[in-house]
A protein has these predicted regions:
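A cross-family phosphate/adenosyl-ligand binding-site feature
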Residues: 2-3, 13-82
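Short glycine-rich anion-binding loops that position phosphate/pyrophosphate groups of nucleotides
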Residues: 9, 38, 67-68, 91-94, ...
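Short beta-strand segments
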Residues: 33-35, 65, 88-91, 122-123, ...
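Glycine/threonine-rich flexible loop motifs
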Residues: 94-103
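Glycine-rich phosphate/pyrophosphate-binding loops
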Residues: 113-136
Length: 233
């Protein structure tokens, strides 16, 4: 089994290291093609009018001066890799509901799906002030990936997985819940302040205060369980 890994937090992010550990625990061959710098909330942006700089940092590890979707394109069509799966993450922050259209993490998995490669986006919801137990998350991810591999994915669909945030320490794998993405929009609010002849608007909405549709991925993840959704192209 060959896993192509990418993310939007950057090639040196701890979430990508945790995803690498999870893949290796499954005995998979791992190739990493990830952004050289953080690309959070870049959506499905791709680069077509300027060259993409790619630095090979190790035998199977490439840093791309581009977006997550760029990384998948480079892997498939420049490096000519033939992965069985593209796994994107593990994002530091949830990608739930409306987030999936903003997320570079999800965009990478979506790009792979467009080209006929099985794909999953994996993210970890964050509660402020609580550290992430990355070693535990790697173990959980291994279990979840085993499940996803065993299940047939409809054509033109990808997996979106969101882990809940629990305090570090021993904890069994939370319940895995199949659910639909929330349809309610994120809360949006700004605070204004003068800036010479212009006005600055600072985003002030709090992610944790977003609407939680009953039975949705938001309700599931915020409630402490693992939200697993199928997204369609």
């Amino acid at each position: 089994m060959h896993f192509l890994l990418t993310n939007d937090d950057g090639i040196d992010a701890p979430g990508l290291a945790a995803l690498t550990a999870a893949g290796r625990a499954m005995g998979a061959r791992i190739t990493i093609v990830a952004p050289a710098t953080e690309q959070s909330m870049c959506g499905h942006r791709v680069t077509t009018h300027s060259p993409l700089r790619v630095e090979q940092r190790d035998a199977d590890r490439y840093a791309v001066q581009g977006t997550p979707a760029d990384c998948v394109r480079i892997a498939l069509f420049a490096l000519h890799l033939k992965p069985d799966w593209v796994l994107s993450g593990i994002n530091q922050g949830g990608n739930l509901g409306q987030d999936t259209f903003i997320s570079g993490t999800v965009a990478a998995a979506r790009e792979a799906t467009y080209h006929g490669v099985k794909a999953a986006a994996l993210s970890h919801y964050i509660k402020g002030g609580i550290p992430i137990d990355w070693e535990r998350l790697a173990r959980w991810t291994t279990e979840v990936l085993h499940d996803l591999q065993a299940e047939a994915v409809p054509e033109a669909h990808l997996w979106n997985v969101n882990f809940p945030h629990h305090p570090p320490g021993p904890l069994a794998l939370p319940t895995r819940v199949r659910c639909q993405p929330a349809r309610s929009p994120l809360k949006v609010s700004y605070q204004s302040e003068a800036d010479g002849d212009a006005v600055l608007y600072r985003y002030t909405a709090r992610y944790a205060e977003r609407p939680s549709d009953a039975g949705s991925d938001v309700a599931t993840c915020f409630g402490g369980d693992i939200a697993i959704s199928q997204l369609s192209l």
